[in-house]
Amino acid sequence: MLRKLLTLILFIALNSYSHSVKDGDMDGSWRAIEGFINGEAQEVVDGLMVASEGYMSVNWTGADGNKYFNYSSYEVDSGMVNIEILNHSLDQYIGAKFSHKPNFMGDKKSYITTFVWDDVEYTHRWEKMSCSYEKCARISDFNN
């Protein structure tokens, strides 16, 4: 009985705390669940991302109401995701590079990430699309 209880506690603990990114963790279909720009919650959060084998495509509605997309290459290195934008709905961003450090839940089905772009801080919580029909661990460290 005690062994089962300890096993259950260990299982819950491993799936309740965050983990850094490793190769293959970004692969899959994702949707943005929460979004903040400079700490301000965004009303429209509809980002969709598909990532596989070092490439990703992201579509979203901007704060201005316009639809945007980008196609990027990415590389996972020492807990960081390094991104280079290969195509973007705004030409001036093609070729831009940035990095972010995803903070994953133990089941690797949701993560929070923050990055700064043009002196603006963006924070998003992403979940795998499969979380709409299966139970996934959730993480939120937002102050609301």
Model segments located where?
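Sec-dependent N-terminal signal peptides
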Residues: 4-13
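Lipid interaction determinants
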Residues: 17-69, 82-144
